Curated annotation (Swiss-Prot):
Subunit record text: Homododecamer.
Active site (catalytic residues): Y26, H104
Keywords carried by this UniProt record: Amino-acid biosynthesis, Aromatic amino acid biosynthesis, Lyase
Organism (species): Polynucleobacter necessarius subsp. necessarius (strain STIR1)
Annotated EC: 4.2.1.10
Protein name: 3-dehydroquinate dehydratase
CDD domains named in the record: DHQase_II
Catalysed reactions listed for this entry: 3-dehydroquinate = 3-dehydroshikimate + H2O
Residues given in the record as substrate binding sites: N78, H84, D91, L105, S106, R115
One BP term from GO: chorismate biosynthetic process
SUPFAM superfamilies xref list: Type II 3-dehydroquinate dehydratase
Pathway: Metabolic intermediate biosynthesis; chorismate biosynthesis; chorismate from D-erythrose 4-phosphate and phosphoenolpyruvate: step 3/7
Amino acid sequence: MSKKASILVIQGPNLNLLGSRESDVYGKTTLEDIHQKLGELATAQSVDLSTYQSNHEGELIDRIQKAKQDGVDFIIINPGAFTHTSVALRDVLAGVAIPFTEVHLSNIHQREEFRKHSYLSDIATGVICGLGAIGYELALQAAITRIKK
């Protein structure tokens, strides 16, 4: 019997505030709503989905390292503000060598200059930004397609 595909969704700092934080930029959908929808989609495709959110860089790194040990097949990550600052996140993602998609609710290229650079994009399998919460659904669909190839 083959193991079910496993996808991990990682959420960075302040994403726990979705729905109440700058809804004009990030929308009104909560993180719980996003995770619930992704869970439903994953279940329908017979894929194991786990989610993790932290406001702390080291905890995100620890969880990504654990993903390798757990046999996770794909990571979907919204690194939040760490997108623009964290060489450590880049290093752990490169180190575990699990394919990943970088997701952003807002279009980081239409925002402040400092938000236009990502330390992760050039090593990501794909990048989705500016599509709001549906970006996560598209990332999940792409991950499942890639895993099941």
